[in-house]
Design a protein with these regions (language model features):
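Soluble FAD-dependent oxygen oxidases
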Residues: 1-167
Length: 167
């Protein structure tokens, strides 16, 4: 169970060998965990400790920050990219769904010509699941997770592959 003060994502990244991407990430396959925590610092550190121990950590950017700086959590590119994104909401994350995620986005999926830059599962729930005090346009508050796939539309054959993969 994740407290409502935490937002978390798990991503599979296949980064292109572009010079703009810093080493050691350039041209590699990476698993990424991103977190935002709005609670007590000590409680957040306790929740984070098992993640830090679960696997080798290449970069740890967890820090206290102002709300205006939260865009740094994902380390996304600051310049626009020609990309296509597809998202779907999941009410639950079953073992079967995790297996499908790993089959389709994990290290063994389509090595070399894999069209997607990132496939991510984002935990929703928490405060987002609570009904608003006033009427709003937020739907599907019962969705616990968001599944997102992103591909860069680099050249026509890759653009077609990304188009197909994000359907």
């Amino acid at each position: 169970d994740i407290p409502p003060e935490m937002n978390s994502t798990f991503s599979m990244l296949r980064l292109p060998p572009f010079p703009e991407i810093p080493e050691p990430f350039r041209g590699g396959f990476w698993a990424r965990v991103c977190l935002a925590w709005t609670g007590d610092t000590e409680a957040g550190e306790k929740l984070l400790a098992p993640l830090r121990e679960a696997a080798p950590v290449v970069i740890d950017t967890v820090e206290e920050m102002d709300y205006a700086a939260v865009d740094r959590i994902y380390l996304d590119p600051q310049d626009p990219l020609p990309a296509r994104e597809s998202c779907t909401l999941l009410r639950e994350l079953t073992p079967r769904a995790v297996d499908a995620f790993l089959d389709q986005a994990g290290p063994a999926a389509g090595a070399g010509d894999y069209p997607l830059l990132m496939v991510e599962i984002r935990h929703m729930g928490g405060a987002l699941a609570r009904p608003a005090d006033v009427e709003d346009a937020v739907c599907a508050r019962d969705a616990e997770y968001l599944l997102e796939a992103v591909g860069v539309l680099a050249a026509p054959p890759m653009a077609e592959a990304v188009e197909h993969a994000t359907r």
